[in-house]
Structures are given as structure tokens and as C-alpha cells.
């Protein structure tokens, strides 16, 4: 397992991407899969940087582990922050069938994450938001 702790500010997104990508490339070169995971990382990290400590700032801890030998191989990404308690899984799914002008703002990002990953969980424990996403690697994507 690899982990990093970083200031939860938008400007650090590239560093988070580099960290996650380096860990993923130890097990896969599947560019589509890496793009999907990076999209989820972007949504989650930017939500932490925008809302977790508002007003104010704080840090985010990101853990990456790849498990499974030989298959199925699963990538676990855990995001932790000490910000305001917020369970994104409790939010109502946006109405993607509604006209754009009739939609409520927000919620599309976590909807996208939920529909991209194979598993997602949230807990608030000891003053921390802990969000974990799981993505299964296709059998033929192992490096």
C-alpha cells in the first residue's frame, strides 16, 4: 500500500494524479482504465479541496492498494480528510433525464464516480471522512 498526505487545494491535483498513476502502472498499462480512475480521483479530490474545510483549508490523505493474486485484481483508493462530515453516498442521484435548465445543480460528479467504479463506501470515523472506491482490473490489463 502506498499513501500520501497533501494539502487539499486544487493546485495539488497534478501531484495527486502523478502519485495515483505511478501506483496503477505497477499493475496495469490499460490507458482507458487509468483515465477512468483519474476522473474519479479528480472528482473526489476537488470535492475535498472545495468543500471539506470551507471556510479554511486542510489536508487529504490518499491511500492506494492493489490486491489480488492472480485474479481478480482490485485497486482500492481511499480518501481521508478531517473536514466537515459529508456522506456523498447519501445524496440523491441527479435526474439525468431532465432538461438541463430543470436540473438541480450538483451531484453529477459523485453519480459519475458511482457509475464508474465497482464498489464505493463511506464512513465518518474518529473525526474523519473516509471514502473508498474499488475498481477491478480486467484480466488482460495486468502488466
Model-derived segments and their meaning:
Residues 10-13, 34, 38, 110:
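Short, structured helix-loop boundary elements
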Residues 3-15:
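STAS-typified acidic loop motif
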Residues 8, 39, 124:
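Conserved strand-loop elements at the edges of beta-sheets that form or border functional pockets
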Residues 1-3, 49-143:
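Conserved beta-strand-loop-beta-strand hairpin that lines the nucleotide-binding pocket
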Amino acid at each position: 500500500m502506498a499513501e500520501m498526505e497533501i494539502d487539499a487545494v486544487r493546485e495539488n491535483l497534478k501531484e495527486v494524479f502523478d502519485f495515483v498513476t505511478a501506483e496503477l502502472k505497477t499493475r496495469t498499462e490499460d490507458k482507458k482504465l487509468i483515465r477512468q480512475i483519474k476522473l474519479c480521483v479528480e472528482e473526489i479530490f476537488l470535492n475535498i479541496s472545495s468543500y471539506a474545510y470551507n471556510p479554511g483549508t486542510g489536508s487529504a490523505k490518499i491511500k492506494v492498494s492493489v490486491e489480488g493474486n492472480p485474479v481478480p485484481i482490485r485497486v482500492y483508493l481511499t480518501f481521508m480528510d478531517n473536514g466537515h462530515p459529508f456522506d456523498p453516498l447519501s445524496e440523491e442521484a441527479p435526474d439525468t433525464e431532465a432538461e438541463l435548465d430543470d436540473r438541480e445543480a450538483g451531484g453529477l460528479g459523485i453519480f459519475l464516480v458511482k457509475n464508474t467504479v465497482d464498489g464505493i463506501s463511506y464512513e465518518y470515523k474518529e473525526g474523519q471522512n473516509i471514502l473508498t472506491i474499488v475498481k477491478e482490473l480486467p484480466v488482460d490489463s495486468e502488466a
